[in-house]
Amino acid sequence: MKLTGLLFAAALLGACTQPAAEENYTRHVDPKIGTGGHGHVFVGANVPFGLVQVGPTSIPQTWDWCSGYHASDSTVIGFSHTHLSGTGIGDLFDITVMPVVGEVTYARGEENDPASGLWSYADRTREITKPGYYSVPLVRYGITAELTATERVGLHRYTFPASDAAAVVFDLENGGCWDKATDTGFRFSDDSTRIAGWRCST
């Protein structure tokens, strides 16, 4: 009887102890695997089965950049809300947003000549990629971009330097690779606090 009582007491004490700390499995994830070579992997913020994959889109429009990102490149033409990953064919890049400082241009620009368009080099040494979050400094503008996502929404936060010439450009025309806009438009709400828009493409 004493042995049964001791075992019962030990079981009760064991049940009263703190549960083991939850393991953070996302710390083992490297979202940049497959972004070099011919991997065509998207880098940015998304959630499983989400409708948006918000992340950077680079200026090159060739096969290895069909996800919008390649490890060998540090250009950013904007942050698009839809990307394909690992497909080997380019599409989407819908609703691209680019924070800028200074004179606004709507030209895409030429590779190796940032002054020809609105794009910037990204500081890849300070880039942060983890599940559900992406951040990178834009060298040309001194802006830090941060992105995260829900199932249906891409969320952006931009930290600008002190300036009277800060702006955010919404690019409805430029897609990626073989994607071409066929119908685009936007409108402001009556109180100018919201923007609604659309982009249809091939």
Regions found by a protein language model. Name each.
Residues 1-9:
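Sec-dependent signal peptide recognition
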Residues 14-15:
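C-terminal motif of bacterial Sec signal peptides marking the signal peptidase cleavage site
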Residues 20-202:
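Accessory carbohydrate-recognition regions in carbohydrate-active enzymes
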